[in-house]
Each structure stands twice: as C-alpha cells, then as structure tokens.
Amino acid sequence: MSSPDGGYGSDDQNQGKCSVPIMMSGLGQCQWSEPMTSLGEGKLKSDANSRSKAEGRIRRPMNAFMVWAKDERKRLAQQNPDLHNAELSKMLGKSWKALSLAEKRPFVEEAERLRVQHMQDHPNYKYRPRRRKQVKRMKRAENGFMHMTEAQESAVMGTDGRMCLENFNLGFHEQTYPQLPQASHYREPQAMAPHYDGYSLPTPESSPLDLAEADPVFFTSPAQDECQMMPYSYNSSYTHQHNSGASMLVRQMPQTEQIGEGSPVEGMMACQSSPHMYYGQMYLPGSTRHHQHPQAGQPSPPPEAQQLGRADQTQQADMMAEDRTEFEQYLSYVSKSDLGMNYHGQESVGPTADNGPISSVLSDATTAVYYCNYPSA
C-alpha cells in the first residue's frame, strides 16, 4: 500500500525507480543517445594523454631569473593574494632589474649548474618552441568573430525576435546603374542644345502640354533643309492656291527683283513648309492668318519659325530704307499678308469664302496702279 505523500521520502520511491527500467526494457535504448560511461571514459583518456605529453616533453633548463623568481613569486603571492599573475610578473621583473650583480651571482651560478646537468642528462636535446602565440591569436580572432555582445545581438535581432537583415553591415554597397536615355529625344530640348549651338538658334519656350501630347515635335537642323522637305499633312488645294498666287506675284514683279538673292516672295513661299510640318494636321486652310497665335494645347513654335520672322523684319526694314517705288513695296506688303504673317501691327483679318488670295492680289494690284498713275497735287 502506497503512502499518502505520493512516494516521496518513503520506500515506494525506490520501487518506482526500479519499475521504470523494467517498463522501458521492451523499447530499448535510443540510437542517438550516448551512454554516460562513454563520456566519462573520453575525459579520462584526454587527461591521460595530456599528462603523458607533458611528461614526455623535455623542459628547458632554468636561467638565473627563473631560479630567483621561483621562490620570490611564492612569497609575493602570499603577501598579495588578490594580485593577478601578470601583475606579479611585472613586480618580479622590476625587482630583478633593481638587484646588483653581487646579489645576482648565486642565482647565475645555480643556473649554470642546471644547464650542465641538463646537457648531461639529454645530450641530443634540441629546443623546439611551441607555437602558442599564434594559436592564441587565432582563438582570440575566432572568439571575437563568433561571440557577440548583448547589445549587438539586440541590434541584429528585432524587438519581436525576428532577424533584421538591414542591421547586417556586410560591406556590400548597392550598385547604381546609369539611367537609360529616354527614347523620345525630342521631349528633351536641353539634351539637343549642343547640336544646335553652331546655328545660334533661340531656345523654344516650353508648353505645359508638351509632355501630355502624343504627337512628336520635330526639331530639324537649318531652315534650308526644312525648305527642301515636302509638307505631309495639309490640303493639296490650299498648296495649289498658294503656288499659283506666288507665280502671279513673280510675274508682276520686275526682273531685277526676281534675279536678286533673297527675294522676299520666293523665300517665304519656299519656306512656307516649316509651319505645316511643325503643326501637322492641326494646320488648316482657314487658320492661315492666325497660326502665329497658337492655342493652349499647341506646343511652342520651333526656332526656325522665329528666325524666319526676324529675317523678314530686317529684310522689310532694308526695303523701306532703299529708294524703291511705291508699287514694289505695296506688292511685297500684300504678299506677306496673304501668306498669313503679320508685321508691324498689321491687323489679322480672316479671308472670306468669296475672295481668295488670287482675287485679293489682283484687286490690290489694280488699286495700286490706279493711285500710282494718279497725278499728285
């Protein structure tokens, strides 16, 4: 019958201990568990091997300082039990240096006797120093690399026990790749600025809807190349009307005006393709006299158009300065207004459906001839 205290402090406890091996005998011993006897035997074997190596290794004979410090170290250790062995060695070295030669003589003689005795006992002895310093350095390096302080562990581990990979400073730097140039080079006029430095072109003003616009904006090189290019997105009938009007104006002008370089009519008619190519399909026949005022959704005009306007202004000033007839000046003024370019405060009046550019040129020419032949008072 078992005791009420559950077997603690009674004989039933021993019976319970004995019954456990009997109950577990059928299961057998686990394969991964090692018996306690093997661990104890391993420790005993390692101690025996270390002792045999120490006994088999021949020690070097003591010098005079070692003979003197053998007894002196014991005496200092008894006087200062709290001092570390390194501190005792420092004190022994200072006191040994402080001794005179007469005081060191008996210890030197004793060290010589021990050396002779050692040579007699071990004639084939050769000093083989133990590389303990290198081993200690390696152990210190391994300990410093493997073991971390609690502060470092808390820095590496998060507050909830998870690993924070950002805290590892492994020496890897993020590699930055250069950004690829944008495919739409026409969207960046600053990158193309060095290409146009030789032409001394003005910088076009940017529009707020340049980025949102899907159609590309073409920035071609000089105006001469642009004059040779053919427009692609305007009405063919409108082109025919302008060409016919230009031919009529050229026929009416004298030969000296046609042969001279930089004729205003030929230059403007030849370079009229630049507004067409710039504005594309948005350039309509009805808006010929108003294209110099673009809407909010249109991009800023190209630099070639601004340069063309400045060249025409200077050319008109030269024409006004020269002594020409009123008939020639009036024809050049009419041709510019019909082409949709306003100069010096000219009012832009849209053409009507009845009067085309040819009829307006003919009517204005007849009026000019009439007033030119009229005798002045």
From Swiss-Prot:
GO terms for molecular function: beta-catenin binding; DNA-binding transcription activator activity, RNA polymerase II-specific; RNA polymerase II cis-regulatory region sequence-specific DNA binding; sequence-specific DNA binding. It is found in: Nucleus. Residues 326-331 are annotated as: Required for transcriptional activity and interaction with ctnnb1. Induction: Involved in multiple regulatory feedback loops with other endodermal factors, including the nodal-related factors/Xnrs. Autoinduces. One of its GO terms (cellular component) is nucleus. GO terms for biological process: angiogenesis; cell migration involved in gastrulation; endoderm development; endoderm formation; heart development; hindgut morphogenesis; midgut development; negative regulation of canonical Wnt signaling pathway. Keywords: Activator, Developmental protein, DNA-binding, Gastrulation, Nucleus, Transcription, Transcription regulation, Wnt signaling pathway. Residues 42-57 have a biased composition (Basic and acidic residues). Residues 58-126 bind DNA. It comes from the Eukaryota. Enriched in the embryonic endoderm. Expressed in the embryonic gut, with strong expression in the posterior gut during tailbud stages. Expressed at a low level in the adult kidney and spleen. Residues 262-376 form the Sox C-terminal domain. A motif (9aaTAD) lies at residues 325-333. Residues 1-20, 31-57, 282-321 are annotated as: Disordered. InterPro entries: HMG_box_dom, HMG_box_dom_sf, Sox7/17/18_central, Sox_C, SRY-related_HMG-box_TF-like. The 9aaTAD motif is a transactivation domain present in a large number of yeast and animal transcription factors. Interacts (via C-terminus) with ctnnb1/beta-catenin (via Armadillo repeats); this interaction is required for inhibition of wnt-signaling. Transcription activator. Binds to the DNA sequence 5'-AACAAT-3'. All of the sox17 proteins are required for embryonic endoderm development and gastrulation movements, and show some redundancy in function. In addition, the sox17 proteins have distinct but overlapping roles in later gut development. Acts downstream of vegt-signaling in endoderm differentiation to induce a range of endodermal genes both directly (including endodermin and dhh/chh) and indirectly. Also represses wnt-responsive genes to inhibit wnt/beta-catenin signaling. This is Transcription factor Sox-17-alpha-B. It comes from Xenopus laevis (African clawed frog). The gene is sox17a-b.
